[in-house]
Amino acid sequence: MELATRGKVKEVLFMNTGEGESSYVQNSSFTEKVASMAMPALENAVETLFSKDFHLFQAINAADLGCATGPNTFAVISTIKRMMEKKCRELNCQTLELQVYMNDLFGNDFNTLFKGLSSKVIGNKCEEVSCYVMGVPGSFHGRLFPRNSLHLVHSSYSVHWLTQAPKGLTSREGLALNKGRIYISKTSPPVVREAYLSQFHEDFTMFLNARSQEVVPNGCMVLILRGRQSSDPSDMQSCFIWELLAIAIAELVSQGLIDEDKLDTFNIPCYFPSLEEVKDIVERDGSFTIDHMEGFELDSLQMQENDKWVRGEKFAKIVRAFTEPIISNQFGHEIMDKLYDKFTHIVVSDLEAKLPKTTSIILVLSKIVG
């Protein structure tokens, strides 16, 4: 099934479910590190809410968009609650309530997510801040909440996913324009780069438009997304995962295990923007001001092991956890073990040349009044 429509992507875009060896719960260490790097921005956002007297409303409504199933969303809840308690003590204010909405697409494993919730995360109802948690399935590219209902929005490593594979990647004759690749590469024609940027522009604008209606004036958004430092979208730093996956798929094509047409017609619905591209879209939309924006780099392999096979296998599991549902939809569930085994071998070979660092973008926005 080609990912050419929004409805189809919604059905297959989610992290690996459950708590098994290939699950996102067991393989979210990298996004956990990214989230921890961005926690100061979230803490500052909560401080800002109190400086704008939102605590006088006695309840703060927060949403974590694209929450997935791992421990990261629990860290977000704990951080917001801890900062609210800190400000309550400083301001000697009365007991506050925190309502947290955890959102993701319908395929997300909400059962595992809620099973992981504990009193450690949400506390009890007699504390300074009473915390209530609710699941909200649906696409954040459209409306999810009533108008002017959210004070704080958080999203980590979700906004770079697209609603569909970019439009216009086949010629008038029906030929694939990104043949042999699943993302932008050095060999991709300019039209592929333009199509990806255009799709991200359209989708991120929809995201901002929906939030502009849901977030209260002066409310805050803290967004963390995968991005790039270079102005070139085919820079290896931003596309090496998709390059290595495409090589693994191509090898299985050469072995007759995957139809070549399936590779040629598959384009991953994801885009890693530059800081300039993100800034331009926010300013064009005009609903939010940029309070803070920065890019930071992390080693793609956040591991201490010296054994390159151990490191390669762990990295492959991390990638499998967030790519398998959408990859298996195109190429078949029965081929996944072979594909990711091949991917592991390719990663280990690349470790000799050292994998590029991964760039993340932190974006803190405030809803414009009026």
UniProtKB/Swiss-Prot annotation:
Q: Which residues are noted in the entry as S-adenosyl-L-homocysteine-binding?
A: 24, 67, 72, 104-105, 139-140
Q: Tell me what reaction this enzyme catalyses.
A: 1,3,7-trimethylurate + S-adenosyl-L-methionine = theacrine + S-adenosyl-L-homocysteine + H(+)
Signal peptide per UniProt? none
Q: Which GO terms describe its biological process?
A: alkaloid metabolic process; methylation
Cofactor comment = Binds 1 Mg(2+) ion per subunit.
| Residue positions binding 1,3,7-trimethylurate | 31, 157, 160-161, 226, 322
Q: Which Gene3D superfamilies did the record assign?
A: Methyltransferase, alpha-helical capping domain, Vaccinia Virus protein VP39
What SUPFAM superfamilies does this protein's entry cite? S-adenosyl-L-methionine-dependent methyltransferases
In which pathway is this protein known to take part? Alkaloid biosynthesis
Top-level EC class, please?
Answer: transferase
Site note Involved in substrate discrimination applies to 154, 226, 270, 318, 333
Q: Where are the transmembrane segments?
A: none
Key words, A-Z: Alkaloid metabolism, Magnesium, Metal-binding, Methyltransferase, S-adenosyl-L-methionine, Transferase
Binding locations of Mg(2+): 178, 264, 266-267
Q: Which Pfam families match?
A: Methyltransf_7 (PF03492)
InterPro entries recorded: MeTrfase_7 (IPR005299), MeTrfase_capping (IPR042086), SAM-dependent_MTases_sf (IPR029063)
Provide the E.C. number(s) assigned to this enzyme.
Answer: 2.1.1.-
Q: Which cofactor does it need?
A: Mg(2+)
Q: What is known about the tissue distribution of this protein?
A: Expressed in leaves of cv. Kucha, but not in cv. Puer.
What is the documented function of this protein?
Answer: Involved in the biosynthesis of theacrine, a caffeine-like xanthine alkaloid with diverse beneficial biological activities including anti-depressive, sedative, and hypnotic activities, improving learning and memory, increasing exercise activity, and preventing nonalcoholic fatty liver disease. Mediates the conversion of 1,3,7-trimethyluric acid to theacrine.
Q: In which family does this protein belong, per the annotation? A: Belongs to the methyltransferase superfamily. Type-7 methyltransferase family.
Q: What else is known?
A: Caffeine is catabolized to produce theacrine in Camellia sinensis var. assamica cv. Kucha, but not in cv. Puer.
Q: What is this protein called?
A: 1,3,7-trimethyluric acid N-methyltransferase CkTcS
Organism whose genome encodes this protein: Camellia sinensis var. assamica
